[in-house]
UniProtKB/Swiss-Prot annotation:
Protein name: Uncharacterized protein C9G1.07
Classification lineage: Eukaryota, Fungi, Dikarya, Ascomycota, Taphrinomycotina
GO cellular component, one term: Golgi apparatus
Bias-annotated ranges (Polar residues): 322-337
Low complexity: bias regions: 304-316
Region (Disordered): 282-346
Length: 418
């Protein structure tokens, strides 16, 4: 303020009655020195005078009165009162640094841009939003105003700390942090721990575009949807292994619905109806699949021979060892055996072929299918090899007995041509 008044003090020498500085000094109670006459008149000084006349008359007391009238009385913090006993809202240190910051006296355009109330507003923002008056009094430098770059950086840093879940420690006692956001005090609660009333679970009357406005209703809708999806996944994973357990679980879940009145009908949600349809289709398909497998198993068991013949389709099946064990267990002396040479000469049967003229079963007459010769050839080869290894050379053999013997050892293959 002193520099500004001294810059226009030349006006007392030329026109003392039209002097802006002398007129305000007489009406001011602040300790402002008298204007000297040692400032020479110049074109630059006239520009300063014209700009100063466009401004309102102000000093420290007038500024504080305008601030109190516009924004209300602001009580200074205790730390500022202790640092400056004669604190009236804006100290001399703060006003000097403020004037240097806006380059008063160095830039002609600065005065033209400072219209009515501009300085008051800027100083008020500095005192209320970013109060560093104590650091100004102690250090006399490094002032941070609300429009400076350092203030903006610190403000963004503070905002990031405020939005973070963990509040950082404040090392600088001269910095006043802004008020915390209401969202920072919001405590999240797990959905599973919320007790949802039973009447909220009924969404049958809601339209497709209607959304529950209540937070508890939204939570209940989300909780119900998650439960239905989990229940559906559980039923999809367990219906193949145990359809009976699925029915029991459905009955247990239905029994949990409590009906207060006998005439009262509990409406079912669309989600539960869709899930029930899906479960019915899956259950029907699983039962049909189980029935078909059981039918095939029973057919194989019915058509199998009474001698518990092994399955020729298995990988570990060997005809030679099985025939040998059957011959040893029966110990039949009336069955004739012969060597490979005698069999081929007298019966005229080639080693790798088998005649089906007398092959028949009690229930149905069987003709050899297309794929049967390859199987019978392997059976006949294994059987003859076993005969060559375990029997001696017998020259007399009956063709019919040999065929009947082979047929007796074979399992019933009638199910292959059904």
């Amino acid at each position: 303020m002193d520099d500004l008044l001294n810059s226009v003090s030349f006006s007392n020498a030329s026109n003392p009655h039209n002097a802006w500085g002398s007129e305000n000094i007489s009406n001011s109670n602040s300790a402002i020195p008298s204007i000297t006459n040692d400032v020479s008149f110049s074109m630059e000084a006239s520009v300063w005078k014209e700009n100063a006349l466009n401004l309102d008359t102000f000093n420290l007391k007038d500024i504080n009165e305008k601030l109190d009238y516009t924004f209300g009385v602001v009580k200074p913090p205790k730390r500022i009162s202790l640092a400056s006993k004669d604190y009236i809202g804006i100290t001399a240190t703060s006003e000097t640094n403020f004037r240097q910051l806006i380059r008063l006296g160095y830039n002609e355009k600065s005065l033209g841009e400072l219209k009515q109330g501009t300085i008051s507003r800027l100083l008020k923002e500095h005192m209320t939003l970013w109060n560093q008056e104590r650091s100004n009094v102690n250090r006399k430098s490094n002032v941070l105003f609300c429009w400076s770059t350092a203030y903006q950086k610190q403000k963004r840093k503070t905002a990031s700390y405020t939005n973070s879940p963990v509040t950082p420690p404040i090392n600088d006692k001269n910095i006043l942090l802004p008020e915390q956001s209401p969202l920072s005090n919001f405590s999240t609660t797990k959905i599973s721990s919320i007790n949802v009333p039973s009447d909220i679970l009924d969404f049958s009357n809601l339209s497709s575009n209607e959304i529950p406005k209540d937070y508890s209703s939204s939570t209940a809708l989300l909780n119900n949807t998650v439960a239905v999806k989990q229940d559906h996944k559980l039923s999809a994973n367990t219906f193949l292994s145990s359809p009976v357990k699925l029915i029991e679980r459905e009955s247990n879940s239905c029994s949990t619905i409590s009906i207060n009145k006998e005439d009262e009908v509990v409406p079912k949600s669309p989600l539960s109806l869709d899930r029930k349809k899906v479960d019915e289709v899956e259950e029907h398909s699983s039962i049909a699949k189980l029935d078909s497998e059981e039918k095939i198993r029973e057919t194989k068991k019915k058509n199998s021979s009474t001698s518990l013949s092994p399955d020729p389709t298995s990988d570990n099946f060997e005809w030679g060892s099985w025939v040998s064990s059957q011959d040893t267990s029966k110990n039949s002396s009336n069955l004739a055996s012969a060597s490979v040479d005698d069999v081929s000469e007298e019966s005229q049967v080639e080693p790798n072929t088998l005649i089906f003229q007398n092959f028949s079963s009690p229930s149905t007459s069987l003709s050899a299918p297309k794929d049967t010769p390859a199987v019978i050839q392997s059976i006949n080869t294994s059987f003859l090899n076993n005969e060559r290894a375990g029997r001696g050379n017998i020259k007399t053999v009956d063709q019919n007995q040999l065929i009947n013997r082979i047929v007796d050892k074979l399992p019933d293959l009638s199910y292959l041509v059904d």
